[in-house]
Amino acid sequence: PIRRQRQMCIRDSIQGAYRFVDGSMQVASEMINVIRANGGTVLNNSEVTRIIVDNNQVQGVEINGTERIDSKYVISNVHPKQTLTLLDKNRSIKNAYISRINSLENTYGIFTLYLVMKEKSYPYLNQNLYLHGDNDVWYDKKTNMGCTTNCMISTQASSRNSDYAEVISILTPMYIDELSAWLHTLPEQRGEEYKAFKKEKATQLLEFIKSHGIDFTDHIEAMYTTTPLSYRDFTGTCDGSAYGIIKDYKCPQVGFVSTRTKLGNLFLTGQNLNVHGALGVTLTSIITCGELLGHEYLAKKIGHA
């Protein structure tokens, strides 16, 4: 099953880099609409600070350290390590399981450079560009950390003008180790040295791109950057990891995390469990839902939708 899921993800990537005109926020907005249409509630600015356990059953969650929400089931899509830190002490989740989850290594994070382009100054590219410094396409912490050796360039589609790029996103790997000086800081409180670090990294990235014959310099109106710290603080992802827990195709069971937990009404989902990325998250959510609804029932329901 794992190999089949990976083949689906690879096929999806090879077939094309599809974009949402005017951004992917539309997907989140539509999901919110569907949830509300079915009687659900979506809460903003509501951080789960505790998963309440009593008599070895999850009773609900605590929001922002104050408000309690009772529930029959809890599904967590944050990193399993983060989920375990939120759990009340219980006899069902064994120390050996906690130690294994905590020992699993995460993938690298992403440094992202957003270029706001001058109006009608740079053509829209209906494809992604992948640039590599050499024939070795794999980014390695031991040999590549701190260096720009590869990146992806993606122009964002806009309904206002389909011929020119308004925003260009440039992504390059970055481990959180590079940001050790600011590990214990919060957004907007990291100081001038952090801003200088990001500016230097952006310059390095633009120079790397220029060495491949692409020069954005005269077309840039403004620049914005994010680091793995941004992803860590806004999404709760351990180490600001881009793809969650590392999966070894030679030994997949090492990084395997089940959607079920030893607490009967606590379930896990998200890219840390099976396959990473948008398609992986979708597949994993189906597996998690199947635990509640029944896999055969859900498969037929999807098949006849």
Q: Residue ranges of each PLM-predicted region?
A:
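A glycine-rich dinucleotide-binding beta-alpha-beta segment and adjacent secondary-structure elements
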Residues: S211-V275
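Active-site-proximal substrate-binding core of FAD-dependent oxidoreductases
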Residues: E47, V53, G294-A305
